[in-house]
Amino acid sequence: QDTYLNAKKYIEFYLVVDNGMFXKYSXXFTV
């Protein structure tokens, strides 16, 4: 299922961001 794979990718990306990488990119991105 492509939808499941896409969701998994998105979730994994979100987890990486939530792991602290967000602080590294927060300077580049405005949230």
Curated annotation (Swiss-Prot):
Inhibited by 1,10-phenanthroline. One of its GO terms (cellular component) is extracellular region. Expressed by the venom gland. Residues 9-31 form the Peptidase M12B domain. Contains 9 disulfide bonds. Ca(2+) binds at E12. The modification Pyrrolidone carboxylic acid is found at Q1. Binds 1 zinc ion per subunit. It is found in: Secreted. GO terms for biological process: proteolysis. Its EC number is 3.4.24.-. Keywords: Calcium, Cell adhesion impairing toxin, Disulfide bond, Fibrinogenolytic toxin, Hemorrhagic toxin, Hemostasis impairing toxin, Hydrolase, Metal-binding, Metalloprotease, Myotoxin, Protease, Pyrrolidone carboxylic acid, Secreted, Toxin, Zinc. Its cofactor is Zn(2+). Transmembrane segments: none annotated. It comes from the Eukaryota. GO terms for molecular function: metal ion binding; metallopeptidase activity; toxin activity. Snake venom zinc metalloprotease that has potent hemorrhagic activity, fibrinogenolytic activity on the alpha-subunit of human fibrinogen (FGA) in vitro and provokes necrosis in skin, muscle and lung tissues. May contribute to local edema and ecchymosis induced by venom. Hydrolyzes model substrate (beta-chain of insulin) at Ala(14)-Leu(15). Monomer. Belongs to the venom metalloproteinase (M12B) family. P-III subfamily. P-IIIa sub-subfamily. This is Zinc metalloproteinase alsophinase.
